[in-house]
């Protein structure tokens, strides 16, 4: 793990387990730290969930947008 970056590869996980795993990792982050998510589809629904539950507490930035893998960095603010 890079300093301040926690990478979570969701591709091997069943879809039903993914959001639970993401929010478990998210809760452990300190302000300024980043959760780097690697996924096999665009995690846009995850963004909407963060917007509803964590509004004002995160910044989201795509590092890669498909076509096979999506990488998103979610920073705790």
Predicted regions mapped to residue ranges:
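Positively charged, polar, low-complexity stretches
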Residues: 2-77
């Amino acid at each position: 793990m890079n300093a301040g970056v926690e990478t979570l590869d969701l591709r091997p996980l069943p879809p039903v387990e993914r959001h639970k795993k993401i929010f478990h990792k998210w809760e452990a982050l300190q302000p300024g730290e980043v959760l780097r998510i690697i996924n096999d589809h665009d995690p846009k629904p995850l963004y909407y969930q963060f917007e509803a539950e964590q509004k004002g507490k995160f910044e989201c930035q795509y590092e890669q947008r498909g076509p096979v893998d999506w990488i998103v960095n979610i920073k705790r603010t």
